[in-house]
Amino acid sequence: DHGSHPELRTEWWYITGQVRAEQRLYGFQVTFFRSRVDGTQSMQSEFAARQLIFAHAAVTDVQGKRQFHDQRIARAGFGIADASTTDAAIRLRDWSLTRRDLPSTTAAFALSQFRTQVVASDFSLDLTMTGTQPPILQGAQGLSRKGPLPEQASYYYSEPQRAVSG
């Protein structure tokens, strides 16, 4: 279940990794958030900001010891920002993160591929991350407790060791 859950207050999708380009090592981080605005849920106007989509991204030139970063925010809708409920497909203006299942392999688990595209003022990314192992669930069956109360929890899993290209 990689899609958005609009009834929940906050969700995020993030990727971190490193990639080599032109004999240089770069670190990268891209995070998309979806946040439900509780105070606007009963409003009838299409202009009510019921869901906010925001994102930040960074690239580090390891050898050059420089970091570049940027961020975006918009309310969902109007063709500007969206987080699909059916799969990981998040878009915020010209930034995106999408997921797709890969054709069946001999692996004992289903592999998937993520792609992120980010056009920032000082950098751009177009990366594909292909799964190499099954997801790792955090906590009890992916439910990660954040406090003593049952509602103080979130579902959380990681997909490490993805093969990165782009």
Located regions from the model:
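Targeting-peptide/extracellular-domain and disordered-appendage signature
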Residues: 1-166
